[in-house]
């Protein structure tokens, strides 16, 4: 039986497995080998940031490459290491730093999937004659054929809601989805760990990757300051009502919705409401000023069955949306008009930051289809806060 939905025997089906050196991709390789597929393991060397290479929970660095090699030896498949460090720096690390300089809060994992993994590695898999590229992501794909595209597939949330990675995969294109396979989509993480133990894999008890892989000890500001010194320039901390409350040592130390460590006190709780990168101002205000009901999107990747503009015009497209990875999908309407493509959130969200993602779904449950999404370009707050912010941004900045 071909579990990957190909009309041929497993032994006649070549699969490249993207192996990060973690337990998930290792188990994928082991499962496919057991099922009789022609499996090749490929690990990408993406960066070498000193301490990050040996940091527990990093990925695609020195120790992880060695772990992937040992796993491949155990299960009996070839293993290759490709040096993508330059490509990773150009398409992931540099844009990450530039996004922070612009006052955004980026998601480099999405950029990595978009470029290095699902573009470059996928192309390499095809050059090797593989029928599919398999990964250890927790997401499901199923056949969704049409008359013009009999091999078309669709994405769905995974069985293990706690491991749902669909938010980070919203930008996966239809062509990539048709070629990719996600064997862990229907499996809880506990079962993955148990399989790793059963297979005798060296990574069975290895900790899951945490934070951003190329950031040593999770200190984003150190990496950004090194790559983009302008992000560390001092500026004003300003209240929405126009009062200058103090000064900061660089907008790279702040993100929308932040409360702790702002550096000023007024007696009332204050939150970061906006990062004015042009004037190097950190704008703060009360919690209610964070309430967001509309987000405008850029770089939209639409995975619905009808064309985007056709679906989103007029009354809009009723769906569910996530504006942060840890939140469940909430009711929303996708719209398109002369102002662009945007999502109206039925239930307001606090602390929505530009640069983050808005992923779209068919339903709120674990079996929901993924309709794609886009990066948040800007958001609209409740009317009074929005008016105050616009007035403040239009005012001159003291020299």
From Swiss-Prot:
Region (Interaction with tRNA): 163-165
Primary location group: cytoplasm
Residues of the site described as Interaction with tRNA: 137, 356
Keyword terms of this UniProt record: ATP-binding, Cytoplasm, Disulfide bond, Nucleotide-binding, RNA-binding, Transferase, tRNA processing, tRNA-binding
Gene Ontology molecular function terms on file: ATP binding; tRNA binding; tRNA-uridine 2-sulfurtransferase activity
EC nos: 2.8.1.13
GO cellular component terms, semicolon-separated: cytoplasm
Binding site for ATP: 18-25, 44, 136
Active-site residues from the entry: 112, 213
Reactions mediated catalytically: S-sulfanyl-L-cysteinyl-[protein] + uridine(34) in tRNA + AH2 + ATP = 2-thiouridine(34) in tRNA + L-cysteinyl-[protein] + A + AMP + diphosphate + H(+)
Entry keyword annotation includes tRNA-binding: yes
Entry's Gene Ontology BP terms: tRNA wobble position uridine thiolation
SS bond partners: 112-213
Compartments where located: Cytoplasm
Organism superkingdom: Bacteria
Primary role: Catalyzes the 2-thiolation of uridine at the wobble position (U34) of tRNA, leading to the formation of s(2)U34.
UniProt similarity note: Belongs to the MnmA/TRMU family.
Protein name: tRNA-specific 2-thiouridylase MnmA
Organism: Rhizobium rhizogenes (strain K84 / ATCC BAA-868) (Agrobacterium radiobacter)
Organism lineage string: Bacteria, Pseudomonadati, Pseudomonadota, Alphaproteobacteria, Hyphomicrobiales
């Amino acid at each position: 039986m071909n579990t990957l939905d190909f009309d041929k025997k497993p032994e006649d089906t070549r699969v490249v497995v993207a192996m990060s050196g973690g337990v998930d991709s290792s188990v994928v390789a082991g499962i496919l080998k057991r099922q009789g597929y022609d499996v090749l393991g490929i690990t990408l060397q993406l960066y070498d940031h000193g301490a990050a290479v040996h940091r527990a929970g990093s990925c695609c660095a020195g120790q992880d490459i060695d772990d992937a090699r040992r796993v491949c030896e155990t299960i009996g498949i070839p293993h290759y290491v490709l040096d993508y460090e330059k490509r990773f720096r150009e398409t992931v690390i540099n844009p990450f730093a530039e996004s922070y300089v612009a006052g955004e809060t980026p998601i480099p994992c999405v950029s990595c999937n978009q470029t290095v993994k699902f573009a470059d590695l996928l192309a390499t898999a095809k050059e090797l004659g593989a029928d599919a590229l398999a990964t250890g992501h927790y997401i499901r794909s199923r056949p969704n054929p049409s008359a013009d595209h009999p091999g078309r597939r669709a994405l769905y949330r995974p069985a293990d809601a706690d491991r749902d990675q669909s938010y980070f995969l919203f930008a996966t294109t239809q062509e990539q989805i048709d070629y990719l396979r996600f064997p862990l989509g229907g499996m809880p993480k506990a079962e993955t760990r148990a399989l790793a133990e059963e297979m005798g894999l060296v990574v069975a008890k290895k900790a899951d990757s945490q934070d951003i892989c190329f950031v040593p000890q999770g200190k984003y500001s150190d990496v950004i300051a090194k790559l983009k010194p302008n992000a560390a320039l001092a500026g004003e901390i300003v209240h929405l009502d126009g009062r200058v409350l103090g000064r900061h040592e660089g907008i790279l130390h702040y993100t929308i919705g932040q409360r702790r460590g702002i550096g000023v006190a007024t007696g009332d709780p204050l939150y970061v409401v906006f990062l004015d990168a042009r004037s190097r101002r950190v704008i703060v205000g009360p919690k209610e000023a964070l309430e967001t009901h509309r987000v405008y999107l850029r770089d939209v990747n639409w995975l619905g069955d009808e064309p985007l503009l056709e679906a989103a015009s007029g009354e809009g497209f009723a769906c569910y949306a996530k504006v942060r990875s840890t939140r469940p999908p909430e009711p929303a309407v996708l719209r398109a008009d002369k102002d662009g493509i945007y999502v109206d959130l039925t239930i307001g969200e606090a602390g929505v930051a530009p640069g983050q993602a808005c992923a779209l779904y068919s339903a709120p449950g674990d079996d929901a289809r993924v309709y794609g999404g886009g990066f948040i370009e800007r958001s609209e707050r409740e009317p009074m806060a929005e008016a105050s912010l616009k007035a403040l941004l239009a005012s001159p900045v003291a020299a």
